[in-house]
UniProtKB/Swiss-Prot annotation:
Organism: Escherichia coli (strain K12)
Subunit structure: Monomer.
Gene Ontology biological process terms from the UniProt entry: photoreactive repair; phototransduction, visible light; response to light stimulus
Pfam families for the chain: DNA_photolyase, FAD_binding_7
UniProt lineage: Bacteria, Pseudomonadati, Pseudomonadota, Gammaproteobacteria, Enterobacterales
Residues engaged in binding (6R)-5,10-methylene-5,6,7,8-tetrahydrofolate: N109, E110
UniProt protein name: Deoxyribodipyrimidine photo-lyase
Encoding gene per record: phrB
Length: 472
């Protein structure tokens, strides 16, 4: 008998799952599913407890959904990726597996694991799929057959390639001829977990699909006007579903174009499409530049920047106690919810690196440890952009003023007051510099003074980058 094994990783869904669809194409084959938890590896990669909770819930939903299709989900737990190779080999042997199907992961450790799995399964046909991207790495290259290093030409080439042939979404599998089965006992991951707001970050696949549809109908067209203002619900909040594979990027693209057909030609919805393309760009980059997965900067000379070691400043930033309200409100949102508005990710990252002169890798690590939507490629890309160490990054002399950023994107301080209750009584726009108001009003605030003076910090940071650039 032909036996197909689907190895689930970051693709916890039935709809538009390329590996699952391929495994189920042969109606006479026996189909099994496998998920391997690797807690020690997750800890090494700084997976957040909220993302672990989301994965745990999605796994249990997936197990039930697969059982309804007649596909049992086998759950195994080992320490790390190295040990998972033996588990795949063992499961294949125990179940006489003839074909293994899985969706590619592009991070360096994951790719090394998959090479070892294919090497170990000499008598099993292994098929991998580019499921977590719309266009696979290698599909969008320069005229010299190199990976693009600048986003805009990549985007233009990506759109040109997309118009030549848009990848379709594949349907969820039908019930196997053997009929539905009883699901196994519920899964509990042996990893720290933390609850989150399921209204913002849905667990069920159908709820994630509904959230996508609602955003594309009602939010994508206004995304360009609303996306930078954290007090407004102007973003999709689909990042967590994309990070764990509860949704596919193809589903996002097709739904967007169904609701906003002009998005492909620069019309309404095109700015959100740009965000999907940025996601593709960073995934393609880590495939062709695996050193990015190893905490190396893309621009080599930036590794010579003399970062400051200041645990007190790092802790103040992590806890949202820097004395800069927009930075602190953003960090408290992150710590409280496991999510942060994208504009605020740029502001807080810039502050850590260019006001505190703390190594961007400290911020990259902390974000991953807190984010429900933690994604190595996107998180690394964002941090290297803010730190001016990455490809197509902000120039090193571009340094956000945290006060003016707050005034620009949270003009009346609505977001700040939501997350900093100690500033709720500070009136109007002066909430961006509460220490000045408190001094004039003769009021004592339960809120810290700024831990650095921005103008002085800017001078110090520019000098540090200049010295590194000149090799001093």
């Amino acid at each position: 008998m032909t036996t197909h094994l689907v190895w689930f990783r970051q693709d916890l869904r039935l709809h538009d799952n390329l590996a699952l669809a391929a495994a189920c194409r042969n109606s006479s084959a026996r189909v099994l599913a496998l998920y391997i938890a690797t807690p020690r590896q997750w800890a090494t990669h700084n997976m957040s407890p909220r993302q672990a909770e989301l994965i745990n819930a999605q796994l249990n939903g997936l197990q039930i959904a697969l059982a309804e299709k007649g596909i049992p989900l086998l759950f195994r737990e080992v320490d790390d990726f190295v040990a998972s190779v033996e588990i795949v080999k063992q499961v294949c042997a125990e179940n006489s597996v003839t074909h293994l199907f899985y969706n590619y992961q592009y991070e360096v450790n994951e790719r090394a694991r998959d090479v070892e799995v294919e090497r170990a399964l000499r008598n099993v046909v292994c098929e991998g799929f580019d499921d977590s991207v719309i266009l696979p790495p290698g599909a969008v290259m320069t005229g010299n057959h190199e990976m693009y290093k600048v986003f805009t030409p990549f985007k233009n080439a990506w759109l040109k390639r997309l118009r030549e042939g848009m990848p379709e979404c594949v349907a969820a599998p039908k019930v196997r001829s053997s009929g539905s089965i009883e699901p196994s006992p519920s899964i509990t991951l042996n990893y720290p977990r933390q609850s989150f707001d399921t209204a913002h970050f849905p667990v069920e696949e159908k709820a994630a699909i509904a959230q996508l549809r609602q955003f594309c109908q009602n939010g994508a067209g206004e995304y360009e006007q609303q996306r930078d203002f954290p007090a407004v619900e102007g973003t999709s909040r689909l990042s967590a579903s994309l990070a764990t594979g509860g949704l596919s990027p193809r589903q996002c693209l097709h739904r967007l174009l169904a609701e906003q057909p002009q998005a492909l030609d620069g019309g309404a919805g095109s700015v959100w499409l740009n965000e999907l393309i940025w996601r593709e760009f960073y995934r393609h980059l880590i495939t062709y530049h695996p050193s990015l997965c190893k905490h190396r900067p893309f621009i080599a000379w930036t590794d010579r920047v003399q970062w400051q070691s200041n645990p007190a400043h790092l802790q103040a930033w992590q806890e949202g106690k820097t004395g800069y309200p927009i930075v602190d409100a953003a960090m408290r949102q992150l710590n409280s919810t496991g999510w942060m508005h994208n504009r605020l990710r740029m502001i807080t990252a810039s502050f850590l690196v260019k006001d505190l002169l703390i190594d961007w890798r400290e911020g990259e690590r902390y974000f991953m440890s807190q984010l429900i939507d933690g994604d190595l490629a996107a998180n690394n890309g964002g941090w290297q952009w803010a730190a001016s160490t990455g490809t197509d990054a902000a120039p090193y002399f571009r340094i956000f003023n945290p006060t003016t950023q707050g005034e620009k994107f949270d003009h009346e301080g609505e977001f700040i007051r939501q997350w900093l209750p100690e500033l709720r009584d500070v009136p109007g726009k002066v909430v961006h510099e509460p220490w000045k108001w408190a001094q004039k009003a003769g009021v004592t605030l339960d809120y810290p003074q700024p831990i650095v003076e921005h103008k002085e910090a800017r001078v110090q940071t520019l000098a540090a980058y200049e010295a590194a650039r000149k090799g001093k």
